[in-house]
Amino acid sequence: MNIPFRVGQGFDVHALVEGRPLIIGGVTIAHTHGLLGHSDADVLLHAVTDALLGGAGLGDIGRHFPDTDPAYRGADSRVLLRAAFDKVRAAGWAPVNVDATIHAQAPKIGPHAAAMVANIAADLALDAGAVNIKAKTNEGLGYLGRKEGIAANVVVLLARAG
């Protein structure tokens, strides 16, 4: 069966720690803590990358950019996203739209959302109107509410490239 569309879903979470920059959606945000990870720990772009790869049936971010590989230590997640985008296009798929939710008690994401949208749209060759970013607090509940981490959920619609 030749289905013209696929949906990819991505999720990522990273702990907040002192001494690291906070980078979300390719935007460096002034904050007391940053996200812990092997790369730049961009929770949003990691979830977008997973959604793209998963929708195309290409596995996940860890398969293509393993955290055991020193080549990816401190890696810019926009570079990883663009590499994943190239793999998805080579497999015959193109993103149609991206819908993302960032879960963070702090900092406020709203002032940075437009820049995040612009970065993702540029990296995926989409119009900015095809990328949506929402932000939610956890109402003080759980590890997110205690400001111990930040998470992101992403859904991507892919169409057969033609």
From Swiss-Prot:
Catalyzed reactions: 4-CDP-2-C-methyl-D-erythritol 2-phosphate = 2-C-methyl-D-erythritol 2,4-cyclic diphosphate + CMP
Binding site for 4-CDP-2-C-methyl-D-erythritol 2-phosphate: 12-14, 38-39, 60-62, 65-69, 146
Keyword flag Nucleotide-binding: no
PROSITE patterns (alphabetical): ISPF
GO biological process assignments: isopentenyl diphosphate biosynthetic process, methylerythritol 4-phosphate pathway; terpenoid biosynthetic process
Top class in the EC scheme: lyase
Cofactor: binding comment: Binds 1 divalent metal cation per subunit.
Residues annotated to bind a divalent metal cation: 12, 14, 46
Pathway: Isoprenoid biosynthesis; isopentenyl diphosphate biosynthesis via DXP pathway; isopentenyl diphosphate from 1-deoxy-D-xylulose 5-phosphate: step 4/6
Keywords: Isoprene biosynthesis, Lyase, Metal-binding
Enzyme Commission number(s) from the entry: 4.6.1.12
Function, in words: Involved in the biosynthesis of isopentenyl diphosphate (IPP) and dimethylallyl diphosphate (DMAPP), two major building blocks of isoprenoid compounds. Catalyzes the conversion of 4-diphosphocytidyl-2-C-methyl-D-erythritol 2-phosphate (CDP-ME2P) to 2-C-methyl-D-erythritol 2,4-cyclodiphosphate (ME-CPP) with a corresponding release of cytidine 5-monophosphate (CMP).
Family to which this protein belongs: Belongs to the IspF family.
Subunit description: Homotrimer.
Protein name: 2-C-methyl-D-erythritol 2,4-cyclodiphosphate synthase
Organism field: Bordetella pertussis (strain Tohama I / ATCC BAA-589 / NCTC 13251)
